[in-house]
Amino acid sequence: MSKTFAEIAETFLEPEAVRIAKEAVEEYGDHERKIIQIGIHFQVCCMFCDEYLSTNGSDRFVLIEGRKRGTAVSLQNELCKSYDLEPLPFLCDIFDREEKQFVEIGITRKADDSYFQSKFGKLGNSCKIFVFSYDGRLDKNCEGPMEEQKLRIFSFLATAADFLRKENMFNEIFLPDNEETIIEMKKGKTFLKLRDESVPLPFQTYEQMKDYCEKFKGNPRELASKVSQMQSNIKLPIKHYEQNKFRQIRLPKGPMAPYTHKFLMEEAWMFTKISDPERSRAGEILIDFFKKGNLSAIRPKDKPLQGKYPIHYKNLWNQIKAAIADRTMVISENDHSEFLGGIGRASKKIPEVSLTQDVITTEGLKQSENKLPEPRSFPKWFNAEWMWAIKDSDLTGWVPMAEYPPADNELEDYAEHLNKTMEGVLQGTNCAREMGKCILTVGALMTECRLFPGKIKVVPIYARSKERKSMQEGLPVPSEMDCLFGICVKSKSHLNKDDGMYTIITFEFSIREPNLEKHQKYTVFEAGHTTVRMKKGESVIGREVPLYLYCRTTALSKIKNDWLSKARRCFITTMDTVETICLRESAKAEENLVEKTLNEKQMWIGKKNGELIAQPLREALRVQLVQQFYFCIYNDSQLEGFCNEQKKILMALEGDKKNKSSFGFNPEGLLEKIEECLINNPMCLFMAQRLNELVIEASKRGAKFFKID
């Protein structure tokens, strides 16, 4: 740290102000000139607060500025709670107990009110704003402050300005108004600590790893000897891919793979209502839908369109309506709920035999043979559902996200703008709808599993969203909507281990007839009619359509609960991928090219009629999100094995692209390993087909390592 700034600060600032400023600069890695700026601001805040009492004799002002960020946030939240105020999304400097308002203090050397206007644009009238200038001007959005406060503060600022001018430091601390602000980056303590923690083993610190990498020199002879040694140990000949080309992956044949996600996606139909903040619990939402929407009138017909156990599902549906009507959300144990919930149907262990009893025969100890899953072919329905997930839904704001913290500098403003741009594209997609459904529904199931493990409970399959802007101006737009997709019954759930399973029975609404190949696992009933709103010209008309009830018994594990309830993480991976591309392009050009990159850079998203389809990065975001979410919902051992092996082919493809030689020990064995993972997972089969298409396209463009059958 430069001693010049610290020494000057110590000559005219209070010791406490200097200490606070030094700690802030060291913690956040700011420029040394900030010592004087922060110190002056803190001392002005102290002058604003000191020696002023409320009518009851206690201190009128509470000083928030100068505390550690965590402590300051806690204090501000406590004050909001104590005085029944709305929590603020940003930190203020002071709290006025007498007027029950927060106060923001600003200090500027500008001759106009631009600094005040920028603060007012961010904060509005949510708090008092006082901006003091070195030339004696005060900009504010309310009455005050007291005359004595103003005199003390202006006197101090004038003294500070004179002192800094004598030391020729006034212009050093503040950049001239006609120059652009320079963003100077410095590594703070937290950054350095996280950087050292992230280095791979065997390195202990970043500097150690950096030193090793800088001194490392590749030795071709040494590398060749290591390869030869590895070859002699494995006793397999090295095969260069130019002579031993990769063939296409053979997809399994047979019936199409069925739909295996826990909830319907493209076929799902939802009932909507305006959200009531006072009735936001899952059970209350379900009661309101059945009461106001008359959903109790839904009655499945006796004969299903397809599926097994229709009597059990019909009786359980009647029990669900009774549980909602009496507001208990609990279903009593009976033959139907126990059968569908799998209660008492677990395989029994072989009984222990005491020494005094006869020994049981070897035949009695034999375990039934495990049946391997039947191989399934690529499902035609998957492509249609993939494209549906990419498109926009009627509503937006499906995934609940935390509010952005207040930006403290231009770099954070820039990052916030980029994230809001990407989030605006993603939040209105059908994929975001399904993510929101998983987050809230599985979150409610997790709560019921923890609180009522021994009970059979009713939980809504629901999500929350916001309406898009009305097509006709002047119509009121509800801020938030509750969307009900169906009802889920949780069976008994004693989850002692992470892989512990529990049964759920889902009843989901749809206005589409079932696809026998896709919905093999469902029992489907006709259940009456519903009204669909359709836009015809400038008016909206209602049309009655049949309503179907899709019923299914499936299971969830403790681990799957965690994955689905945290599906919003798919946003992070997606946005991080695109952000990296944008920042890399900007770094190359040494200018802000974010908007240009989002709108002009193309990404391959698929193939149609034998030709590649590419879209701008802004729209390709959707494909990235769908891919991440599908990894989340279809994840199993097949998908993990496939992804682990396919990357070796992709590495060879990248090497071919860079005109480098690639080799391995057993290319045919690698393909066989991949094909072992292709059984009945729809996502695996989809990715294998995409990989084949990628290989075909690469071969057309001159790739040397692949051959087309």
From Swiss-Prot:
Modification(s) after translation: Phosphorylated on serines and threonines by host kinases, including human casein kinase II.
Locus of motif Nuclear localization signal 1 (NLS1): 109-124
Molecular function terms from GO: endonuclease activity; metal ion binding; RNA binding
Binding positions for Mn(2+) 1 per the UniProt entry: 41, 93, 104-105
EC number: 3.1.-.-
Enzyme class: hydrolase
Binding site for Mn(2+) 2: 65, 93
GO annotation, biological process: cap snatching; DNA-templated transcription; symbiont-mediated suppression of host gene expression; symbiont-mediated suppression of host mRNA transcription via inhibition of RNA polymerase II activity; viral RNA genome replication; viral translational frameshifting
Family: Belongs to the influenza viruses PA family.
UniProt-recorded name of the protein: Polymerase acidic protein
